[in-house]
Swiss-Prot record:
The gene coding this protein: erpA
UniProt protein name: Iron-sulfur cluster insertion protein ErpA
Highest taxon above the source species: Bacteria
CC cofactor: iron-sulfur cluster
Residues the record lists as binding iron-sulfur cluster: 44, 108, 110
Record's subunit section: Homodimer.
Organism of this sequence: Pseudomonas fluorescens (strain ATCC BAA-477 / NRRL B-23932 / Pf-5)
Protein's job: Required for insertion of 4Fe-4S clusters for at least IspG.
A single GO molecular function term of this UniProt record: iron ion binding
Length: 116
């Protein structure tokens, strides 16, 4: 009998996303704020992404740090986000945080919901 260890695939936090988080945190004047990314049921494809700023970090949260700011994900959401990339984009549709998720089999046109 063999035992295999499992290391979860990291969640990528791009420089562009980290820079935007830093800008927003600096504007608020609260360096305890972290960007929390989560997955909930809903949207046109079954699951949807959410973003919020949070001062609290739970013991079992995954934390990704870059440029002095933190991205936080709860364990339930992380199972859907392992290997994904959190980025920030500016375009004709406006500015927003986006997730490029290799686990998603389909995504909606706006990119905020997905299915696995």
């Amino acid at each position: 009998m063999s035992v295999e260890s499992f290391t979860p695939t990291a969640l990528q936090f791009t420089q562009g996303a980290a820079h935007k988080v830093k800008t927003l945190v600096d504007e608020e004047g609260n360096d305890r704020l972290k960007l929390r990314v989560f997955v909930t049921g809903g949207g046109c494809s079954g699951f949807q992404y959410g973003f919020t700023f949070d001062e609290e970090v739970a013991e079992d949260d995954t934390i990704v740090e870059r440029e002095g700011v933190s991205l936080v994900v709860d364990p339930m959401s992380f199972q859907y986000l392992a290997g994904a990339e959190v980025d920030y984009q500016e375009g004709l549709e406006g500015s927003r945080f986006v997730i490029k998720n290799p686990n998603a089999t389909t995504t909606c046109g706006c990119g905020s919901s997905f299915s696995i």
